[in-house]
A protein has these predicted regions:
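Phosphate-binding loop of NTP-binding sites
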Residues: 2-4, 79-213, 217-227, 410-411, ...
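Generic hydrophobic/aromatic pocket-lining and core-packing "Φ" positions
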Residues: 47, 160, 195, 199, ...
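AMP-binding/adenylate-forming catalytic core of the ANL superfamily
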Residues: 191, 333-394
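Short glycine/threonine-rich catalytic loop with a Thr-x-Gly-x-Asp
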Residues: 20-24, 39, 276-287, 310-316, ...
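Acidic, Mg2+-coordinating active-site environments of NTP-dependent enzymes
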Residues: 2, 60-67, 173-325, 350-351, ...
Length: 432
C-alpha cells in the first residue's frame, strides 16, 4: 500500500488499531469502535461497553456520552466515511467499482476468483455494499492488497455517486440496468441515471469502464467524454464467451480474437465446464473473463477459476434432497432477474419443473405490472408456477397461490412433492 501521507488524528488512531467495527457485539481488544445511529438503535449507548471490551477508543457523536478513550465528532457516519476515504487515498492499487440491477454479487465473486489467480484481491464481503458497508470494506483492505473490488448497491439516485466519492474507483463495471428498486429510483429512467453515476465518476477521473457490448443501454450510458471504454462480450468485442447449440448446460467456450473465426481459447484444456446456468450467468462470466484478460491473468488460470466456481449462498445454488432437486435463488428478486431466471430454468430440460415465486419488493407503482409480466413469462415458458405473497395474489395468481410462506410450507408438508426440480425465487424479505 502506497500513496501520499494523510495527517488525520482519527486515521492515526486507526493505524494503531486492529480494525474498525460499528457493531458493539463485535467489539474486542485493539478495535476502534465508531458509533452509528439507526432507526431502532443508537450506537452511542454502547460506547462505554466497547471500551470495557477492550476497544482502544470509541467515536461518538452524542456530547452527553462521557468517559475515557472517547472521541467526539459531529456525526459518526460522516466520520466513518471520511476515515475510509482517507485510508483509500493512501494506496495506489486498482480500485474496481461494481454495480448493476442484477448479478452484482455473482459477478463480483467471479472476478475475485479470476483476478485472485494472479493478484492479492480484497473484495466486498457479503452485502456490505451501502453507505456503511463500503467504508467498512475499504477500512478492512490489507496493506499488501493488489486489487480492491468494491460492490456498490443503491436504491435511490445519488447513492452511487456518494459511494464513488468515498471509494474513488479507477476501474468500474455496471452489470446491467433492469427493473430493480423502481420505487426508490422513480422508474426505469431513474435506475439508468442512478447506475450511470459510476460511469460519470470514472469519466471525471479519466478512469476505465468495462462495458458489455451486447447491452445497448450500457453502450449509451457509457458514451461520456473522458471515459475509457473497454467493450466486451460479442464476437466483435472480445473476450466473448458462448455455449454451443445455445444450451444452458452445454460447455462454455471463449475467445479473445476479434474478427477471426470463432474458436475456443481454452489453453489446451478442452471446453470449460462450469457450475452456473442461464444466459444471465453467461454474461457474468464474460465480465469476469474480460477483467481477467485485461489484468494479465492467463487463459489456463481463468479456466481454473471459473471451473471451480460455485454459486454463492442463495444465488442459484442447487440443493439435492431425498425427494427433489431445489435451485435456491432467494437472495433478491425483481422482474428482470426473475424473467431471466425463469427462461433459463425452462430451457434447461429439467424433469417435472416447478417454479415457486415470491413477491418482488420495492416496485412501488410498478408492482402490478411487474408481477403480471413475470407470470406471463412463466406461461410463455410453459412452467408450472406457484406464487407466494400479497402482490402475486392480487395481480398475478399462479397455478397455485399462497398468501405467505407459512401457507406454502403447510401445503408442502401435507401433500409432499417428489421427483421434481423446483426453482425457489423471491425477494429476501419473503423468507423463501
Amino acid at each position: 500500500m502506497e500513496g501520499p501521507g494523510v495527517h488525520d488524528p482519527l486515521l492515526e488512531l486507526f493505524d494503531q488499531s486492529n480494525g474498525v467495527t460499528t457493531d458493539s457485539r463485535q467489539c474486542g481488544p485493539g478495535l476502534l469502535y465508531i458509533a452509528l445511529k439507526g432507526e431502532r438503535f443508537d450506537g452511542n449507548a454502547f460506547a462505554l461497553e466497547a471500551i470495557r471490551k477492550g476497544c482502544i477508543a470509541a467515536v461518538v457523536d452524542n456530547p452527553d456520552v462521557k468517559g475515557e478513550n472517547l472521541i467526539h465528532v459531529p456525526d459518526g457516519l460522516d466520520a466513518l466515511q471520511q476515515l475510509a476515504r482517507s485510508h483509500r487515498q493512501r494506496f495506489q492499487a486498482p480500485v474496481f467499482g461494481l454495480t448493476g440491477s442484477n448479478g452484482k454479487t455473482t459477478t463480483k465473486e467471479l472476478i475475485r476468483a479470476v483476478i485472485g489467480q494472479e493478484l492479492k484481491v480484497h473484495a466486498t464481503q457479503g452485502n456490505l455494499n451501502n453507505h456503511i458497508g463500503v467504508p467498512l470494506t475499504l477500512l478492512s483492505i490489507p496493506v499488501d492488497t493488489e486489487f480492491a473490488l468494491i460492490e456498490m448497491g443503491a436504491n435511490h439516485q445519488g447513492e452511487i455517486a456518494a459511494l464513488c466519492t468515498i471509494a474513488e474507483p479507477t476501474f468500474g463495471m455496471i452489470t446491467n440496468v433492469g427493473l430493480a428498486h423502481l420505487e426508490g429510483f422513480g422508474g426505469v429512467e431513474g435506475v439508468k441515471k442512478g447506475k450511470q453515476e459510476l460511469y460519470r465518476h470514472l469519466a471525471s477521473k479519466g478512469g476505465t469502464a468495462f462495458v458489455h457490448a451486447a447491452d445497448p443501454d450500457l453502450i449509451a450510458l457509457s458514451n461520456l467524454e473522458g471515459l475509457e471504454r473497454l467493450p466486451y462480450g460479442t464476437p466483435n468485442h472480445p473476450p466473448h464467451a458462448w455455449r454451443s447449440a445455445g444450451s444452458v448446460d452445454a460447455p462454455i467456450y471463449w475467445s479473445v480474437s476479434a474478427g477471426a473465426a470463432p474458436g475456443p481459447w481454452h489453453d489446451g484444456q478442452g471446453a470449460l465446464e462450469v457450475h452456473l446456468h442461464g444466459a444471465h450467468q453467461l454474461a457474468n462470466m464474460q465480465a469476469a473473463i474480460a477483467v481477467g484478460v485485461h489484468f494479465g491473468v492467463s487463459p489456463g488460470a481463468i479456466n481454473a477459476a471459473l471451473g471451480a466456481f460455485l454459486p454463492v449462498d442463495q444465488r442459484g445454488e442447487t440443493v439435492t434432497t431425498e425427494r427433489n432437486t431445489v435451485i435456491v435463488d432467494c437472495y433478491n428478486a425483481n422482474p428482470s432477474s426473475v424473467e431471466s431466471t425463469l427462461r433459463a430454468f425452462a430451457s434447461a430440460g429439467h424433469e417435472a419443473p416447478l417454479a415457486i415465486l415470491g413477491d418482488m419488493m420495492e416496485l412501488g407503482s410498478h408492482a402490478a405490472h411487474g408481477h403480471r409480466m413475470v407470470r406471463d413469462v412463466a406461461r410463455e415458458c410453459a412452467v408450472e408456477c406457484w406464487v407466494v405473497g400479497h402482490d402475486f395474489a392480487a395481480h398475478a395468481p399462479g397455478d397455485r397461490t399462497f398468501p405467505d410462506v407459512n401457507a406454502l410450507r403447510s401445503a408442502l408438508a401435507e401433500e409432499g412433492i417428489e421427483g421434481r426440480t423446483i426453482l425457489l425465487k423471491g425477494s429476501r424479505s419473503m423468507r423463501m
